[in-house]
A protein has these predicted regions:
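Bacterial N-terminal signal peptides that target proteins for export
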Residues: 1-9
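Extracytoplasmic small-molecule ligand-binding "clamshell" domains
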Residues: 27-97
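An extracytoplasmic/periplasmic, membrane-proximal ligand-sensing/linker region
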Residues: 31-53, 225, 231-296
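A local structural motif
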Residues: 60-70, 85, 162-177, 213-215, ...
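Pocket-lining segment of extracytoplasmic ligand-binding domains
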Residues: 130, 141-239, 246
């Protein structure tokens, strides 16, 4: 009799143990968090708050919690994607190319701009009262770039200056501001003479810097830069990658999401990646003597 009781208790404990383990595994699955990375286009805390509706939308579509992450600089997102601490990034093309080159990150989608086509341009902006009318006039001036890994904030506009015969280390003095909004502020405050940024920066930050709509003008435009890319860490689950792709491809069917992407990133939708377009990014980096394997 005693043996039967003991065996019965053992069975109960085994069942309870299996049940508890099952619950723990279920809870673990429910608590899985996917990190979505962004470069610091603006104040990091504010950006994370602004993109929360995007994270919520993707959470619903993918069936897993998605949280936004903004690094303090551009390379921080690239490194996060490489290590797997960031599962995917919605990042500029040069950052995407770096991630592919350095950690075999997977290009999933590219963005469509307001024209419905992929791509955008970098611009050099000056104040209207600066007297700077040509690229040659930039010699001897103060220039604000955004980040060494920024496509529109350094690589492409820097290449424009180099092609115009300007030695960046000898003919100008320059700094990296850390953000497009910060560069704009430097220009408006007359702390620099020229800034490198993206087309439409004055409209994007008009709320914070209304003078940008009246006091600055474009000096020069770059060749077309491939669109912002959705890039997944090689460590991200393949099924989740497919769910992410489908959710973003369906985004333009959701008016609120489309409006938010357009307002924040000038993105009207996503499409499959044409990898050949990104070869141009590498070519432009070579003009700047940038070794993709050594960028840190």
């Amino acid at each position: 009799m005693r043996n039967k009781i003991i065996k019965g208790l053992v069975s109960v404990f085994l069942i309870l143990g299996i049940f508890c383990c099952s619950k723990k595994e279920e809870k673990k699955s429910e608590e899985k968090v996917i990190k979505m990375g962004f470069v610091p286009l603006k104040n990091s805390e504010q950006l994370v708050e602004d993109v929360k509706p995007i994270a919520d939308y993707l959470s619903q579509k993918m069936g897993v919690k998605v949280e936004a992450f903004t690094a303090s600089n551009y390379i921080g997102v690239v490194e996060g994607i490489g290590s797997g601490s960031v599962d995917f990034g919605i990042i500029p093309p040069f950052s995407a190319v770096l991630a592919q080159k350095q950690s075999n990150a997977q290009p999933l989608l590219t963005s469509k701009g307001k024209t419905g086509k992929s791509g955008y341009t970098a611009e050099l902006y000056v104040r209207k009262d600066s007297g700077i009318k040509s690229l040659e006039d930039v010699k001897g001036k103060k220039v604000a770039f955004v980040d060494p890994s920024s496509s529109s904030g350094y690589i492409y506009p820097g290449a424009m200056l180099v092609k115009a015969g300007i030695n960046l280390d000898k003919d100008i003095s320059y700094q990296f501001s850390g953000g497009h909004d910060k560069s704009l502020q430097l220009l408006l405050n007359k702390d620099v003479d020229v800034i490198a940024t993206f087309d439409g920066v004055e409209e994007r930050y008009a709320k914070d810097f209304p003078a940008a709509l009246t006091d600055i003008e474009k000096l020069a435009s770059s060749d077309t830069i491939p669109g912002i890319m959705v890039t997944a860490s090689s460590k991200m689950d393949k099924d989740l990658q497919e769910k992410l792709k489908q959710a973003l491809l369906d985004m333009d069917k959701d008016p609120k999401m489309k409006e938010l992407f357009t307002k924040m990133f000038s993105i009207t939708g996503f499409e499959e990646v044409d990898q050949t377009a990104y070869n141009k990014v590498e070519e432009t980096a070579k003009v700047m003597n940038v070794d993709l394997d050594k960028v840190k």
